[in-house]
Amino acid sequence: MTGAAMNFTYKTVMPEDIDILVTTRIEVLRAANKLDDDVDMTEVAVQSRAYYEKALKDGSHTAILVYDKEKIIGAGGISYFEVMPTYHNPTGKKAYIMNMYTNPAYRRMGIAYHTLSLLVEDAKNKGIDAISLEATEMGRPMYEKFGFAGMKDEMELK
């Protein structure tokens, strides 16, 4: 970790942190989707809580919150799952990075890059090399700098 990114605290979320994690998740979704505060996110919050309660307990999700003293300024998460083994991924284990966010006042300080490195390290420590993510236009250059590349062999049903 270099530069300004070292001045902050990166905390791996524990089950007792679910309240703040759900609140942060809703804030990230509002920001990413440009949703006003009057948009009802109750169902998303309820489902997010249920997801985190299960996934943090069974290890199928790791979340990181970034603090500037007591203020949350960033977040990131990685979900783990299995598919059928393939030639390129004989274990079938995969990881998907999501919920990456940095408060606009703290951007361009290396916070997202360091959060990403912690999440990738967590996956590698679990023996998972097949790591993917969905990138916004703003985030794409940072992900490419880290080593992520566009995928040509996958499609999504619309």
Q: Which sequence ranges carry the predicted segments?
A:
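Conserved acetyl-CoA-binding loop of GNAT-fold acetyltransferases
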Residues: 12, 128, 144-154
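A short helix-loop-beta-strand connector motif used in the catalytic cores of GNAT acetyltransferases and
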Residues: 50-64
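Conserved beta-strand in the GNAT
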Residues: 65, 71-80, 96, 101
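Conserved acetyl-CoA pyrophosphate-binding loop and the N-cap/start of the following alpha-helix
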Residues: 106, 110-118
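Conserved beta-strand-loop-alpha-helix junction that forms the acyl-donor binding cleft
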Residues: 131-142, 156-158
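Conserved GNAT acetyl-CoA-binding A-motif
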Residues: 116, 123-135
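Conserved GNAT-fold acetyl-CoA-binding loop/helix
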Residues: 29-51
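Conserved N-terminal entry element of GNAT/NAT acetyltransferase domains
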Residues: 1-16
